[in-house]
From Swiss-Prot:
Subunit architecture: Homodimer.
Origin species: Colwellia psychrerythraea (strain 34H / ATCC BAA-681) (Vibrio psychroerythus)
GO MF entries: FMN binding; pyridoxamine phosphate oxidase activity
GO BP annotation list: pyridoxine biosynthetic process
Keywords per UniProt: Flavoprotein, FMN, Oxidoreductase, Pyridoxine biosynthesis
Class of the enzyme per the UniProt entry, highest EC level: oxidoreductase
Binding site for substrate: 71, 128, 132, 136, 196-198
Gene from which this protein is expressed: pdxH
Catalytic activity: pyridoxamine 5'-phosphate + O2 + H2O = pyridoxal 5'-phosphate + H2O2 + NH4(+); pyridoxine 5'-phosphate + O2 = pyridoxal 5'-phosphate + H2O2
Entry EC number(s): 1.4.3.5
Protein name per its UniProtKB record: Pyridoxine/pyridoxamine 5'-phosphate oxidase
Amino acid sequence: MTLFEKLRCLFTFGQGVALPLPELSSNTTPDQIFEQWFADANKSGILLPEAMSVSSCNSDGQPSSRMVLLKDYDKEGFVFFTNYESRKSHELAENNKVALLFHWNVLQRQIRIEGTVEKVSIQESADYFHSRDRGSQVGAWASKQSQKLKYDDELKERMSHYQDKFSEGEVPHPEFWGGWRVKPHAIEFWQGRANRLHDRLCFEKDGETWLNHKLNP
């Protein structure tokens, strides 16, 4: 059996676990469905259900993706935190269009989100920064994220430096570290089904109103 034949068997084996879909109406909003699906993912025992792919694109049109952790969400959008000097932050500053993807294989579900980003407030970034464990706070100061290491022990030396510097008192919130809020204008909920006749629920924002429809798989 080839690798692709094995993968096909695994895919077929998992087709019986699809969960029911919500009924759509003109009043249905994507944040309602996201909240329910995220709760389902949490209850399923999936490791890090808050993990999501963030795809950005630079000014030359070159896309890049990476996994980050969702830290907050509401009707306004989806929030994650990072170093503002990282590659993704530079790309988001150049081009504020972004895509997110949640993939929960155990549930045969994925959520695809398209939107634009904006920085969260300094206070919101500082509040979250100070909620992190102390090691992560110091590590944010030590890491020049996405920059080349000059030698193997450089990061260890920088970590040691900041551990000494902030050995007493509160670790200050660095200005180069904070949150991005993804403000969605399109959200698609995908649910796997037998015979690859998958369900696709699509929401598109029209002004302040969310319009919904279903798509062919």
